[in-house]
């Protein structure tokens, strides 16, 4: 099977990019029976070690990670170029790891899109700075749902909100829980623990989950 994947949010520094990088890297390492075709709008060398992965770089006026942000939107011509690239590839299915970077796919091609939650729809006043940004986000979400055969999300609670606030059909939503990145791990290094406690005063005997950033060796 030849599986097409939107990888234009690979360089996103927030959750969308982290999820995409973690999921695809693990998938390519575990599954060598299928061929994967990635569609990007930037040079991508991170997956060159995988012989069963092909990267198709599509020219764009601005990378998705710059264009798909608050108070901005992607060029229709850039999305058309991505559509044509997907339409011209011999794919069996198309997958979008994040609705954030979604673009139209051919209607005849089975498509799956990940919708992580409905926070933007539930609390729009906290997310959008203008009616314009809210309008384009809502339009993209509605088109992505309509264009997809299946929707992937991460929890039953997220599924319920996607149904309630976005209007997706419950029977079209599948749930797959997320695994932590190997970088997140329990430490027994007492020096790090003491330093973390010094930065964030804690009470003795109480358990905490702390995010601690260390330099790579």
Q: Which residues make up each language-model segment?
A:
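Carbohydrate transferase catalytic cores enriched for Leloir-type hexosyltransferases
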Residues: 1-217
